[in-house]
Amino acid sequence: MVGRMCVAVLIVLLLVATAGADPNGAETLKENPELPVDFVWALICGFLVMFMQAGFAMLEAGFSRAKNVANVMMKNLMDFAVGSLAFFAVGFALMMGADWQGIAGTTGWFLAGESYDVSTIELWFFMLVFAATAATIVSGSIAERPKFSVYLVYSAVVSAVIYPIYGHWLWGGGWLSSSEFMVKLGGGYGALDFAGSGVVHALGGYIALAAVMLLGPRLGKYDSDGNPRAIPGHNLAFAVIGTFILWFGWFGFNAGSTLSAHELRVSIIASNTNLAAAAGAVTAMAITWLRNGKPDVGMTCNGAVAGLVAITAPCAWVQPWSSVVIGTIAGFIATYGYWWLEKRGLDDVVGAIPVHGFSGTWGLIALGIFADGSYGLYATESPLVTGLLYGNWGFFIVQLISAIVNFAWAFGTGFALFWILKKVIGIRVSPEEEMLGLDIAEHAAVAYPNFVCTETELPLAMKQGGGR
């Protein structure tokens, strides 16, 4: 009965919605004949970002064991599908709708009414693929042990509420970017994040931290004395290919955030993106080579992604040399951050917490340090953005505040969500299911039907009781 009532209400809302501002684009084109070029640019870049889902899927699959690969792929597929519907119905309105008290948007539900407009829906699509990125980050950290149903609920909540509300604070005219206090302290502008080091990556990374804490480590990850054991992924080639896909897609992520093909700064944005990734990869490779005597493939991949994450916020406002410094520090964060977490009993399968969480925070702070005053809030228009190295200590403090708020919101809401799910339905599969593998346990399928399983972990599962 309740379900039928909800459907009826939804139909009524859609039927009574007023016509969009410009659903066929005629008026928009009349006002600005050059706008189609910008539309094509933004959409193509959005397509690149959407394809990053494949990169995340490949990277996570490569770092996971063969018995869990179908589950990994299914999670990455469905967080985009579920997230698309959630962001369509609720998320976009909360993020980009008419501002209410600097907290959230209040218009644009179901892309109906005035939101049924070519310009608005272009923005919806671009923000959607960012929402999908934020959601899928968590998948890798918690791989090989969560219930698939729990992951679906999580994907819907992140795309509908957690990402949109924080996104509104930065990108929708909310309090972090636009309040009088923040703007005055920053010297004419509040908190900034060009393409999402904080809004997307740190958000996903700190939700992952909360989830990993509540899930517990995989069976066999730690010995009886609490020392970590290596659990190798089944295919490093997948991980490297996934890294290449992410690196390529990131040009759409960062350069596409201009939302305009007429913005010539895209050359610097793209170059900064590449340099930071390269510096992160080389740094992580060097650290593992010196530490272990051989360069680690997985850590090198993570170093590249960490560099990409860190440059995402400052990419439009810093010089190329700064991007190398930012990427180098991100390489240190990715490696030492992973080892630091591992020693504390936090089993992050792909290293997403240091790569996206810690490096995302570093990206927000780096913007407050290295912004050089050559680029403004709106292209070359004043005010031009400067950081600590160029005399604007106030903006540096603004970015520190933004980083603290980002952690508090992401970790707090993520912990609350997974804690509630743990109490209500449970968030982890049984020990027997974990040892069998989530491909069979959750989907009655296997990714490699012709492979012979050589793992004999069921006795260990029974002994350790699921690590909970």
UniProtKB/Swiss-Prot annotation:
<feature type="transmembrane region" description="Helical">
    <location>
        <begin position="194"/>
        <end position="214"/>
    </location>
</feature>
<feature type="transmembrane region" description="Helical">
    <location>
        <begin position="39"/>
        <end position="59"/>
    </location>
</feature>
<dbReference type="Pfam" id="PF00909">
    <property type="entry name" value="Ammonium_transp"/>
</dbReference>
<feature type="site" description="Twin-His motif. Important for optimum substrate conductance">
    <location>
        <position position="356"/>
    </location>
</feature>
<feature type="transmembrane region" description="Helical">
    <location>
        <begin position="297"/>
        <end position="317"/>
    </location>
</feature>
<dbReference type="GO" id="GO:0097272">
    <property type="term" value="P:ammonium homeostasis"/>
</dbReference>
<keyword id="KW-0812">Transmembrane</keyword>
<feature type="transmembrane region" description="Helical">
    <location>
        <begin position="1"/>
        <end position="21"/>
    </location>
</feature>
<dbReference type="InterPro" id="IPR001905">
    <property type="entry name" value="Ammonium_transpt"/>
</dbReference>
<keyword id="KW-0472">Membrane</keyword>
<feature type="transmembrane region" description="Helical">
    <location>
        <begin position="321"/>
        <end position="341"/>
    </location>
</feature>
<feature type="transmembrane region" description="Helical">
    <location>
        <begin position="268"/>
        <end position="288"/>
    </location>
</feature>
<feature type="transmembrane region" description="Helical">
    <location>
        <begin position="350"/>
        <end position="370"/>
    </location>
</feature>
<dbReference type="InterPro" id="IPR024041">
    <property type="entry name" value="NH4_transpt_AmtB-like_dom"/>
</dbReference>
<dbReference type="GO" id="GO:0008519">
    <property type="term" value="F:ammonium channel activity"/>
</dbReference>
<comment type="subunit">
    <text>Homotrimer.</text>
</comment>
<comment type="similarity">
    <text>Belongs to the ammonia transporter channel (TC 1.A.11.2) family.</text>
</comment>
<feature type="transmembrane region" description="Helical">
    <location>
        <begin position="77"/>
        <end position="97"/>
    </location>
</feature>
<feature type="transmembrane region" description="Helical">
    <location>
        <begin position="400"/>
        <end position="420"/>
    </location>
</feature>
<keyword id="KW-0813">Transport</keyword>
<keyword id="KW-0924">Ammonia transport</keyword>
<protein>
    <recommendedName>
        <fullName>Ammonium transporter Amt2</fullName>
    </recommendedName>
</protein>
<feature type="transmembrane region" description="Helical">
    <location>
        <begin position="123"/>
        <end position="143"/>
    </location>
</feature>
<comment type="function">
    <text>Involved in the uptake of ammonium/ammonia (NH(4)(+)/NH(3)). Transport is electrogenic.</text>
</comment>
<dbReference type="GO" id="GO:0005886">
    <property type="term" value="C:plasma membrane"/>
</dbReference>
<dbReference type="InterPro" id="IPR029020">
    <property type="entry name" value="Ammonium/urea_transptr"/>
</dbReference>
<dbReference type="InterPro" id="IPR018047">
    <property type="entry name" value="Ammonium_transpt_CS"/>
</dbReference>
<keyword id="KW-1003">Cell membrane</keyword>
<feature type="transmembrane region" description="Helical">
    <location>
        <begin position="236"/>
        <end position="256"/>
    </location>
</feature>
<dbReference type="InterPro" id="IPR002229">
    <property type="entry name" value="RhesusRHD"/>
</dbReference>
<feature type="transmembrane region" description="Helical">
    <location>
        <begin position="156"/>
        <end position="176"/>
    </location>
</feature>
<feature type="site" description="Twin-His motif. Important for optimum substrate conductance">
    <location>
        <position position="201"/>
    </location>
</feature>
<keyword id="KW-1133">Transmembrane helix</keyword>
